[in-house]
């Protein structure tokens, strides 16, 4: 009986705080908003700015941790769909709170052809409302922002299925660019 009560209290607690997190995120970033600028380094120490991608579509994806099952699956699908994304004029950039060294190892291991940026203090993820705190640990949420060539948010993905996310973005880019579903 006590275990059952604990279970219900835990579910209510998670539902309440999960909803608050969802509500804050969903009302904070809107399609059509200017994408928050960023200045972050990649694994080779090269600095990347949002403005570097002006004139192109940018798939800016936040992910929790290098070389974990879901993050690896997502990154490898982006890798495998790069030709399609590039044909649509899109660049892909991944961001997590991992170090540049961790990104370097992850990118080498899976032959990732796009930059992984180190947001070690979580400030960029926070500006996109894509940061969660587990007590003292900060982790990027699995969110993706499709940014149009003028720097506006064109699409926000907060419920990501890593097995088909990159193809979903390819399909959405085609619709955005042609207006045809």
Feature annotation, model-predicted:
Residues 139-181:
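Thiol-/selenol-based redox modules, centered on thioredoxin-like
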Residues 35-36, 57, 141-143:
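Short loop/turn microsegments at loop-to-beta-strand junctions
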Residues 38-57:
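A short beta-strand-turn-helix
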Residues 5-37:
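N-proximal helix/coil linker or "cap" segments that precede and/or mark the start of modular domains
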Residues 29, 42-43, 147-148:
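Short, acidic, Ser/Thr-enriched surface-loop or helix-capping motifs
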Residues 51-72:
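Short active-site neighborhood of thiol/selenol oxidoreductases, capturing the structured segment around
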Residues 72-112, 120-125:
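Structural microenvironment flanking redox-active thiols in thiol-disulfide oxidoreductases
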